[in-house]
């Protein structure tokens, strides 16, 4: 396993590859959080006392992290589909015959980068969001009791999305197909769910990865949604199923 980890780390060593992923995730998270916080702060004067009391300052500040998931998912997907496309996967398997060991090493190294990107994105998004929300008197600051759990939930969410991307890449093996699938699950599905009748929207939404991510990073939780860590466990189940399927195909099919 040590050799496989060393090989995967060598592939990640080019600074531009890793730094671009982290920078893009942070940029997306900060930009979207800033826009959302600015819009909310500008309408703060029209909020009632009840609205202010129930306002989720932490969740609004971390709203942009959901935009970073696309960058993190693509990072995971491309880490494996590019190797299949260029023929490097066959070379990797010759150098390291244990295919599941190769997959495990790729998961560990890329999950580490996703964790760094997630931590940077969550902290930066929260800092910017709170700064803008303070103009409307809506900021809670870094002392909010729910903040550690929300930041931790955001990091775990992005790590799971990265691992899911690798699993999709191993299963599908083509960049375009895997990216389209991840975009559908993370972006399009939440929109399509809104056309369902009545209470079915709430029942279906709670199973969506994006809704799970929102709840993991919120201070006030939707009673119809999964609790934060329960939702992350559900997402972990999705990842595990996809990973088993991807690992099976990796072992059974030639690159």
Regions found by a protein language model. Give the residues of each.
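Residues that define the loop-to-transmembrane-helix transition and helix capping
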Residues: 19, 100, 176-177
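Transmembrane helix segments
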Residues: 31-34, 175-211
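Membrane-interfacial segments
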Residues: 39-44, 84, 88, 128, ...
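Transmembrane helix boundary and interhelical loop/hinge segments in multi-pass membrane proteins
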Residues: 74-95, 99-100, 107
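Junction motif at the cytosolic side of a transmembrane helix
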Residues: 234-255
């Amino acid at each position: 396993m040590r050799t496989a980890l060393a090989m995967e780390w060598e592939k990640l060593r080019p600074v531009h590859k890793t730094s671009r992923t982290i920078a893009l995730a942070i940029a997306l998270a900060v930009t979207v959080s800033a826009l959302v916080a600015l819009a909310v702060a500008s309408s703060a004067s029209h909020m009632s006392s009840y609205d202010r009391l129930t306002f989720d300052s932490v969740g609004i500040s971390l709203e942009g992290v959901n935009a970073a998931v696309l960058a993190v998912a693509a990072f995971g997907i491309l880490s494996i589909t590019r190797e299949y496309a260029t023929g490097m996967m066959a070379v990797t398997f010759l150098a390291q015959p244990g295919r599941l060991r190769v997959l495990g090493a790729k998961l560990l190294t890329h999950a580490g980068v996703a964790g760094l990107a997630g931590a940077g994105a969550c902290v930066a998004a929260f800092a910017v969001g709170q700064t803008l929300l303070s103009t409307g008197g809506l900021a809670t600051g870094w002392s909010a009791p729910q903040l550690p759990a929300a930041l931790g939930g955001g990091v775990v969410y992005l790590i799971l999305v990265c691992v899911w991307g690798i699993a999709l890449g191993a299963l599908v093996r083509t960049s375009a197909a895997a990216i389209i699938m991840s975009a559908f699950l993370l972006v399009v599905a939440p929109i399509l769910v809104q056309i369902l009748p009545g209470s079915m929207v709430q029942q279906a939404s709670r199973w969506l990865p994006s809704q799970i991510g929102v709840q993991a990073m919120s201070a006030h939780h939707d009673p119809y949604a999964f609790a934060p860590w329960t939702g992350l466990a559900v997402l972990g189940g999705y990842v595990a199923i996809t990973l088993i399927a991807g690992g099976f195909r990796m072992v059974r099919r030639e690159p």
